[in-house]
């Protein structure tokens, strides 16, 4: 499944991006990280495109209270809006 994630940042884009680039979640464990794309909307918003996501694995990693992701992201992320992305077929 392909996703578009709108990240609402409570620190700053640069602070969040440094953590995102360090990859404490181990994105390669649940998505094709070679295709991951990140865009800055403004200093408190980013858009992340994830491809071939294993939703179960992602859920387990992101929500594991023992994961290093939980504490680090709590300092930087207010919330995430997650959207499923599908290719559209042309109308008949």
Please state what every model-predicted region is.
Residues 2-9, 37-65:
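Short, well-ordered beta-strand segments in beta-rich or mixed alpha/beta enzyme
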Residues 12, 42, 75-77:
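Helix N-terminus capping/helix-initiation residues
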Residues 15-17, 58-60, 92:
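Short acidic, gly/pro-rich beta-turn/loop elements at beta-sheet edges
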Residues 21-37, 53-84:
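An amphipathic, aromatic/His-enriched active-site/gating alpha helix that lines ligand/cofactor pockets
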């Amino acid at each position: 499944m392909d996703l578009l994630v709108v990240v609402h940042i409570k620190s700053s884009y640069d602070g969040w991006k440094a953590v995102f680039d360090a990859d404490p979640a181990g994105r390669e464990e649940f998505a094709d990280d070679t295709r991951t794309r990140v865009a800055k909307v403004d200093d408190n918003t980013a858009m992340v495109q994830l491809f071939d996501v294993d939703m179960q694995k992602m859920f387990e990693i992101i929500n594991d209270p023992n994961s290093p992701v939980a504490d680090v992201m709590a300092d930087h992320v207010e919330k995430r809006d997650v959207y499923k992305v599908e290719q559209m077929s042309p109308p008949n």
